[in-house]
């Protein structure tokens, strides 16, 4: 999710047929591709839809986290399964016109633009691999092989480039609870990733949840400077959701 001025841009998927897991891998996949349509929405602070465009083609219909480079929105749309394929689009926020910039033989689930280097960075399914591309005109050129993410703490859902060759990523991980009762514990958090090294330099669990118990960082977010601190917008629910707004204050200010 990206905030430009007083409005927001949000990628979303409309699933018409969920994926089905195979009993054993087939052609390197653990599930079928399912079916659906990818969307990019433009809406205001009240949730009123202003514009919408479809994104993707065929079985490539699942958009991931998006970022803004000051001119273009960058959106990756992938098959809804790991180890698959993606199309990276650049979208003009003024006209909502999308142009293909690259195709990737992997599921790219989040993008972040580093303005200091003119580089686009991406994370794979589960955030296990980190990719780099140089923006060259209307196309992207891969920079080196994918790098392994040394952190297993979060599955990035959305990322954004910040100062000094770093990106801020939000996400969630699910852990099965032991014992006969079982159940799942979902942990949300934020990571500040050093883009030069391809590794997080700061990790912050986010303990705030929605009324129904969803981690605040389960889906897209946007954070920017606000006064002496930060302001964050979070949209954790699937389907119909609520845009949560939180002010993040320095520790001394939050205690006053």
Predicted regions and their residues:
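A short beta-strand motif characteristic of beta-propeller blades
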Residues: 48-56, 97-102, 139-149, 201-212
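Repeated scaffold domains used in trafficking and secretory/extracellular systems
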Residues: 1, 58-65, 105-115, 151-161, ...
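Short loop/turn segments that connect beta-strands within beta-propeller blades
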Residues: 43-48, 91-96, 134-138, 195-198
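Loop/turn-rich, solvent-exposed surfaces of beta-rich toroidal or solenoidal domains
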Residues: 151-201
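Short, conserved, GDST-rich strand-edge loop motifs in beta-rich repeat architectures
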Residues: 11-35, 78-82, 171-187, 243-246, ...
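Blade-loop segments of beta-propeller domains
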Residues: 24-70
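A short loop-to-beta-strand structural motif that recurs across blades of beta-propeller domains
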Residues: 28-31, 38-41, 87-89, 129-131, ...
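Short coil/turn segments that connect the beta-strands within blades of beta-propeller domains
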Residues: 5-6, 70-71, 116-118, 164-166, ...
């Amino acid at each position: 999710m990206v905030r430009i001025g007083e409005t927001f841009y949000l990628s979303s998927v409309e699933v018409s047929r969920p994926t089905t897991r195979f009993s054993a891998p087939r052609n390197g996949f653990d599930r079928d591709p399912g079916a659906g349509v990818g969307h990019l929405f433009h809406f205001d602070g009240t949730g009123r839809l202003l514009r919408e465009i479809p994104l993707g083609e065929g079985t490539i219909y699942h958009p991931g986290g998006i970022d803004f480079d000051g001119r273009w929105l960058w959106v990756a749309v992938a098959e809804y399964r790991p180890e698959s394929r993606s199309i990276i689009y650049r979208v003009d926020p003024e006209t909502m016109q999308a142009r293909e910039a690259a195709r990737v033989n992997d599921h790219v689930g989040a993008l972040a633009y580093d303005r200091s280097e003119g580089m686009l960075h991406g994370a794979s399914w589960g955030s296990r691999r980190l990719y780099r591309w140089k923006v060259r005109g209307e196309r992207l050129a891969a920079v080196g092989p994918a790098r392994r993410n040394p952190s297993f703490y979060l599955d990035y859902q959305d990322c954004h480039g910040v100062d000094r060759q770093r990106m801020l990523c939000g996400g969630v991980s699910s852990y099965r609870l032991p014992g006969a009762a079982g159940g799942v514990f979902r942990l949300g958090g934020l990571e500040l990733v050093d883009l030069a090294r391809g590794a997080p330099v700061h990790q912050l669990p986010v303990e705030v949840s929605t009324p129904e118990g969803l981690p605040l960082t389960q889906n897209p977010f946007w954070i920017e400077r606000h006064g002496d601190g930060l302001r964050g917008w979070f949209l954790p629910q699937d389907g119909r959701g609520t845009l949560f707004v939180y002010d993040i204050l320095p520790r001394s200010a939050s205690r006053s």
